[in-house]
């Protein structure tokens, strides 16, 4: 007799399985991970699941055929651990009053699960990970350490004092750099306005890594900015798709 908690055990085991190749999308205004049905079948046929199934068949039902895989997946749907969904395209997003996003595609709940190979499903099961527990412990320890600051030894207080001064110094340097950078840009417009002005660290406020923010050392206009280059690459990909 199978364990009534079997769907939960299966979902927990395969929640972050590499075979799912899951992505993040926006489902009911929340970031949720979704995958294709055929990917879940592959995860059920993986060595990891097979080994678990052989040791604990009550928790992890054996999968010997495609029909077995469908039965296991249906049990997850009935337990509402996964839900069928549709990935909306740009035009469909606008029809539903949603802003299209390439990074996080919008997902719409489907009324029926057909179990087609390319049908999308979204996870509603989000078990706590070790990282989540460590984060909670870290926050609690941090709060207790802050509350107990008066009891700290003098040497530790001195270290915190110098660290605070260092952080304030970095903030002051960054603010001064931003101010000097802007002043130089405004002055440069009188000499090279046709090139978009002269920038020191053109990527300083771009959405990129810390090291990339300071590369290149200087540039003209926005043509060397990370955001502009990324936008041009997207435009190029769109043109190539249209040609195809």
UniProtKB/Swiss-Prot annotation:
GO MF entries: protein transmembrane transporter activity
Cytoplasmic topological domain residue ranges: 1-132, 180-244
Lumenal domain ranges by topology: 154-158
Membrane topology term: Multi-pass membrane protein
Protein's UniProt keywords contain Cytoplasm: no
Identification of the protein by name: Translocation protein SEC62
InterPro entries: Sec62 (IPR004728), Sec62_asco (IPR011553)
Assembly and binders: Part of a complex that contains SEC61, SEC62, SEC63, SEC66 and SEC72.
Assigned GO CC terms: endoplasmic reticulum; membrane; Sec62/Sec63 complex; translocon complex
Listed GO biological process terms: post-translational protein targeting to membrane, translocation
Subcellular location field: Endoplasmic reticulum membrane
Keywords from the named record: Endoplasmic reticulum, Membrane, Protein transport, Translocation, Transmembrane, Transmembrane helix, Transport
Pfam families recorded: Sec62
Family statement: Belongs to the SEC62 family.
Organism in which the protein naturally occurs: Eremothecium gossypii (strain ATCC 10895 / CBS 109.51 / FGSC 9923 / NRRL Y-1056)
Record function comment: Required for preprotein translocation.
Transmembrane region(s): 133-153, 159-179
């Amino acid at each position: 007799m199978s364990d009534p908690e079997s769907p939960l055990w299966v979902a927990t085991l395969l929640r972050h399985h590499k075979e799912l190749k899951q992505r993040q999308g926006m489902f009911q205004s929340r970031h949720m991970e979704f995958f294709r049905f055929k990917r879940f079948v592959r995860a059920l046929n993986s060595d990891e699941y097979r080994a678990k199934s052989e040791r604990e068949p009550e928790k992890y039902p054996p999968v010997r055929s495609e029909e077995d895989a469908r039965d296991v997946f249906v049990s997850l749907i009935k337990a509402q651990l996964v839900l069928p969904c549709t990935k909306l395209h740009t035009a469909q997003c606008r029809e539903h009053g949603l802003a299209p996003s390439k990074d996080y595609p919008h997902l719409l709940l489907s009324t029926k699960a057909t179990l087609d190979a390319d049908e999308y499903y979204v996870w509603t099961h989000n078990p706590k990970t070790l990282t989540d527990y460590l984060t909670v412990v870290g926050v609690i320890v941090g709060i207790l350490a802050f509350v107990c600051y008066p009891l700290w030894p003098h040497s530790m207080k001195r270290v915190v004092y110098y660290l605070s001064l260092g952080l304030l110094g970095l903030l002051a340097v960054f603010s001064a750099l931003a101010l000097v950078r802007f002043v130089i840009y405004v002055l440069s417009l009188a000499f090279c306005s046709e090139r978009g002005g002269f920038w020191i660290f053109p990527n300083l406020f771009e959405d990129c890594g810390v090291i990339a923010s300071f590369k290149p050392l200087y540039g003209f206009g926005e043509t060397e900015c990370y955001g502009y280059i990324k936008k041009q690459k997207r435009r190029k990909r769109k043109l190539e798709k249209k040609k195809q």
